[in-house]
């Protein structure tokens, strides 16, 4: 689990003391070997229990586990940087050549994939796959780039026999949401988790007794609070990050994993359907 990433993505939710702790950890990550919770509490003017609660909020058992994990993350990051022939800053500028832009985009996407995969709770992911596999009907919602990710997933699921609706029109999305039934699944894809249209559809789905699965960021959001299950994605936000490129990369890694997991549950029949689909489309050429 990448705690530095979790700290960065959860900043908007921190209290005053939690922000002090977060700032201290990031500023002193290279020197954490010699830092105890007592020493840190004294320096920041807060209680030791506040530090322990902060660690637990991030998913660690206590400060010692968080401290050791941060030390490990810092060391791994240093080794990776030293091993890279060309170290590039993540922000793309108007002066960058196409070669430099290509390298930066590639690195940004690599980071999005690495950080997203590091956050996976695989037991929860397996449970989500099982829930989807039993759904009589699946609705996928999303806007903009997230809608493209949803459409890709819908095609894949239809290939292996699932009944799926993935409509771009928000009015149609809302109409489908209110017609869902108990046992149905809604997969809501939204990095911010705050888009009014997606939240409205999730509310309607829950009201109908459907299971809501959110593919979203770590930040607390209306969608995250509505969802029965969440799958976390991480992506770097920069001024030049147009078209949500790294966000789509992270989201696609999640949806591809869901698809492969569903294929594995019924591999023989799924592979037969994929083959039949391929044979049929070949006849259209």
From Swiss-Prot:
Keywords: Carbohydrate metabolism, DNA-binding, Repressor, Transcription, Transcription regulation
Signal peptide residues on this chain, from the entry's feature table: none
Domain SIS: 128-268
Keyword DNA-binding: yes
Residues in HTH rpiR-type domain copies: 1-77
One GO-annotated biological process of the protein: regulation of carbohydrate catabolic process
InterPro entries given in the database record: Homeodomain-like_sf, HTH_RpiR, RpiR-like, RpiR-like_SIS, SIS_dom, SIS_dom_sf, Tscrpt_reg_HTH_MurR, WH-like_DNA-bd_sf
DNA-binding region: 37-56
Pathway field: Amino-sugar metabolism; N-acetylmuramate degradation [regulation]
Molecular function terms from GO: carbohydrate derivative binding; DNA binding; DNA-binding transcription factor activity
Pfam families named in the record: HTH_6 (PF01418), SIS (PF01380)
HAMAP family: HTH_type_MurR
Subunit structure: Homotetramer.
Function: Represses the expression of the murPQ operon involved in the uptake and degradation of N-acetylmuramic acid (MurNAc). Binds to two adjacent inverted repeats within the operator region. MurNAc 6-phosphate, the substrate of MurQ, is the specific inducer that weakens binding of MurR to the operator.
Name of the protein described by the UniProt record: HTH-type transcriptional regulator MurR
Underlying gene: murR
């Amino acid at each position: 689990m990448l705690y530095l990433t979790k700290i960065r993505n959860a900043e908007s939710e921190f209290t005053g003391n939690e922000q002090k702790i977060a700032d201290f950890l990031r500023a002193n990550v290279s020197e954490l070997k010699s830092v105890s919770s007592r020493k840190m509490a004294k320096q920041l003017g807060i209680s030791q229990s506040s530090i322990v609660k902060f660690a637990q909020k991030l998913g660690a058992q206590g400060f010692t586990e968080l401290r050791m994990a941060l030390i490990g993350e810092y060391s791994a990051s240093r080794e990776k940087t030293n091993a890279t022939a060309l170290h590039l800053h993540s922000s793309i500028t108007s002066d960058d050549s196409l070669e430099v832009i290509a390298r930066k985009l590639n690195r940004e996407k690599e980071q999005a994939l690495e950080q997203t995969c590091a956050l996976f709770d695989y037991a929860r992911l397996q449970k989500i796959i099982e829930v989807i596999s039993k759904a009589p009907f699946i609705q996928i919602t999303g806007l903009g780039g997230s809608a493209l990710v949803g459409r890709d997933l819908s095609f894949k699921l239809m290939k292996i026999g699932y009944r799926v609706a993935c409509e771009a029109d928000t009015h149609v999305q809302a109409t489908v949401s209110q017609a869902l039934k108990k046992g149905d699944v809604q997969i809501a894809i939204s990095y911010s988790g705050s888009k009014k249209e997606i939240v409205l559809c999730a509310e309607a789905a829950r009201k109908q007794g459907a299971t809501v699965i959110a593919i979203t960021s770590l930040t607390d959001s209306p969608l995250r609070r509505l969802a029965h299950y969440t799958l976390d994605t991480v992506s770097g936000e920069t001024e030049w990050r147009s078209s949500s490129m790294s966000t789509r990369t992270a989201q696609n890694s999640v949806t591809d994993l869901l698809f492969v997991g569903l294929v594995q549950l019924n591999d023989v029949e799924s592979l037969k359907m994929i083959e039949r689909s391929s044979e049929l489309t070949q006849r259209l050429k």
